[in-house]
Regions:
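Pocket-lining segment of extracytoplasmic ligand-binding domains
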Residues: 99-100, 170-265
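Pocket-flanking alpha-helical
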Residues: 52-54, 77-113, 122-130, 134-135, ...
Length: 325
């Protein structure tokens, strides 16, 4: 009986030790897996923009490698989709136009601005088919207009309609991502298309689309760089590195626009001549967010709330990481 008891006790001890060992291994493996995940910077980008140039050159990876970081790039059809991924924790940072952060903040997304590009009003426009009878924004009354909901061009449409005395309710917005909007535009399913570069320039080149009006005098059309609040608070030094690498990429682009266009062409599937046109009418010069810029964002937010495009009033300064005077 004593021998049997000792045997059972020994078996119990062996099982307990094995369990503790395996649990320790699992915890170590989980810890290593978490460390590996923490060392990956997840960046969202769109079809064209400064981050797209940075990705193509691969310089950010080279700078971060000695620090033990890797970069994971994910492409999105537009800013709203990118910020949704940022909201649910699938990304650490990315870039959008001026309107998407407004919609994201109104939805409670934990995002912060950390930098922006200069204004670029010529980089977006309301287009109509080359043989369309529509000659003015006034003619858009009662028409179907394709646009990516919540994107920078959403604000362009709002401003253009107001400028020409048309109520937002007097047009029929058709919310489509760029690729689907292009198809609808070519098939005649919509009367006009509000779109940004490079889709804008490509539509001009490939379909002969006519510019009804661009953003000049109507919108600022800035490109913003945003991060999840938690990432920004924990990794300000990484945001500084990204900022500096964007600066370098922009200097190279300004000095060699034709070369950069040729380099990006096969990667984007867009002709170099079209990309060069985009680069020529675009402004460069990343800068820290200022109070003035945030105040301009507030005006957009107030307008969207007035039109009931967002469910509540927001304070854009609450999404500010840092303000330079």
């Amino acid at each position: 009986m004593i021998k049997k008891t000792r045997t059972l006790l020994l078996s119990f001890l062996l099982i307990t030790i094995s369990f503790i060992t395996l649990t320790g291994c699992d915890q170590t493996a989980s810890s290593k897996e978490k460390d590996a995940t923490d060392k990956i910077i997840r960046i969202g980008f769109q079809k064209f923009g400064t981050l797209n140039i940075l990705k193509a050159e691969g310089t950010l990876e080279k700078v971060l490698e000695p620090k033990g970081y890797k970069v994971k790039w994910t492409e999105f059809p537009g800013g709203p989709q990118l910020l949704e991924a940022l909201n649910v924790g699938s990304l650490d940072l990315g870039h959008t136009g001026e309107a998407p952060p407004i919609f994201a903040q109104a939805a409670g997304a934990p995002i912060v601005y950390f930098a922006n590009e200069p204004t670029n009003p010529k980089g977006e426009a309301i287009l109509v088919p080359k043989d369309s009878p529509i000659q003015s924004v006034k003619d858009l009354k009662g028409k179907k207009i394709a646009l990516n909901k919540g994107s920078n061009v959403h604000y362009l449409l709002v401003q253009a309609l107001e400028e020409y005395g048309i109520q937002y309710e007097e047009i029929e917005p058709v919310f489509l991502a760029p690729a689907d909007a292009r198809a609808a535009f070519e098939q005649g399913s919509v009367d006009a298309w509000v779109i940004w570069d490079p889709f804008f320039a490509e539509a001009e080149a490939k379909t002969g689309a006519r510019i009804l009006v661009d953003g000049t005098g109507l919108v600022q059309n800035r490109e913003f760089f945003l991060a999840s609040k938690s990432f920004a608070e924990k990794h300000s030094e990484l945001l500084d590195i990204v900022y500096k690498e964007i600066e370098k990429a922009e200097r190279k682009t300004i000095e060699n626009k034709a070369e950069v266009a040729a380099f990006l062409s096969p990667q984007l599937g867009i002709e170099a001549e079209t990309l060069e046109k985009v680069l020529e009418r675009r402004t460069f010069g990343i800068e820290k967010i200022t109070k003035k810029t945030i105040e301009e964002q507030q005006k957009i937010a107030d307008k969207f709330y007035e039109l009931q495009l967002i469910p509540k009033k927001i304070d854009t300064s609450e999404a500010l990481l840092k303000v330079d005077s």
